[in-house]
UniProtKB/Swiss-Prot annotation:
It comes from Sus scrofa (Pig). Signal peptide: none annotated. The lineage of its organism: Eukaryota, Metazoa, Chordata, Craniata, Vertebrata. This is Eosinophil peroxidase. It is an enzyme of class 1 (oxidoreductase). Coiled coil: none annotated. Binds 1 Ca(2+) ion per heterodimer. It catalyses: 2 a phenolic donor + H2O2 = 2 a phenolic radical donor + 2 H2O. Tetramer of two light chains and two heavy chains. Keywords: Heme, Hydrogen peroxide, Iron, Metal-binding, Oxidoreductase, Peroxidase.
Amino acid sequence: GDKYRXIXGRXNNVDXEKTXAQLPPXFPIKIPPNDXRI
């Protein structure tokens, strides 16, 4: 939860996860944009 809260700047890590998936640069750090697996 701290990753999403820190990256997305949201108190609610669930909301941060949803927002980060759509609004850069706040994106889920556990899924790098250069990840060859995705």
